[in-house]
Amino acid sequence: MFSIDLIQQIKEWKRGSTLPICLGCDVGGSGLRVRLSDFHDSAKYVDLGHAKAQKTAELLKVLEDLQQKILQVEPTTVCLGAAIAVAGPIKNNTVILTNWKGPAEERTLSITQLPKGLFPKDRSYFLNDLEAGAYGVIAAYEQSILEENFVQLFTDRAPTGPILAKGRTAVLAMGSGLGAALVTRTPLLKNPLVLPTELGHLQIAPNMATHKYFQDEQELIQHISDHYYGGKLDPEYEDICSGRGLQLAFQFYHKKLTGEVLPLEQIDAGDVAKKAIAGEKDAYNALRAHYIFYLRAAKAIATSLSCESCVLSLDNQVKNHPFVMKIAKELEEEFYEFIRPDWMTSVRVYSQKSILNFNILGTDYMAHAIANKPQ
């Protein structure tokens, strides 16, 4: 549950007979994070931290408790807009969260189930998690804090330029899955528009027989296909560009190195990344493959959507930043190795280097947008 001591700060925002606020919520694999902000000034906010929840019932209990604590602190509080980021396809304002385990009915959430005092009718919005992250990129740009959190990769091949392109920007992130969203700016629209996608589910484009990494890649792809598809179908990028994908890659390279087949339940993706950064060979090869295919996915997405910039974002990118920089030349080779090389010359790639919760920024941004929407 969230601390009432942090909530006390909202009392400072009261101006008249009521205290209008906005609420942004990011639901992750282990729970949720919430930001409360002043409706009149989004620069005034309080981040309540993390609360555990891995079932719908647990999430609702946390939010109902939060609603009670807010009213206990200031009974005149009214929420004018709310946005909540979730992992999974959203249909008819309902989502089955894909980063929680268990039966579907225990991880199904509808917007009508949320406490009305925090999520007002017609002023509340579900966001796909990467959609929220993309709106967070927009929010960070508008607050002039975007550039300081990223480094441009491959500067010997691409021109310098803004992270948030004047036209189209692809925002990608690896976590429990592989998310991708498109940010587009056009004179026809007052504000940038985010298009959520499911492009992480594109099937992998394999290299052909004379490529120097053909044999190794084919064996890895086959290993992943054997696990998920009975060895018949080409895996999707998310099958390797995700936490579960890193587990499978490590299982493959560990067996190749030692002959031992480790059960997946004994492999922790976070530990693999740490071992890779420390230079352990099987983990290094696994994390390298994880990122090679990530850049291949980024290449497919950026070229297909005619993007000027490509943003590799969120916490795992920051944690793995030293490794990314260590293999940057290999990643550059992968990204620019394309059947239409002239298409790649103007695409800029950026990697997040410091922690900034773009999902919370994005949900707060959209909460204020919906709160200020004309009736």
Swiss-Prot record:
Keywords: ATP-binding, Glycolysis, Kinase, Nucleotide-binding, Transferase. ATP binds at residues 25-30. It catalyses: D-glucose + ATP = D-glucose 6-phosphate + ADP + H(+). It holds the Pfam family Glucokinase. The N-terminus is blocked. InterPro entries: ATPase_NBD, Glucokinase. It comes from the Eukaryota. One of its GO terms (molecular function) is glucokinase activity. GO terms for biological process: glycolytic process. Its EC number is 2.7.1.2. The keyword Transcription regulation does not apply. Monomer. Belongs to the bacterial glucokinase family. This is Glucokinase 1. It comes from Trichomonas vaginalis.
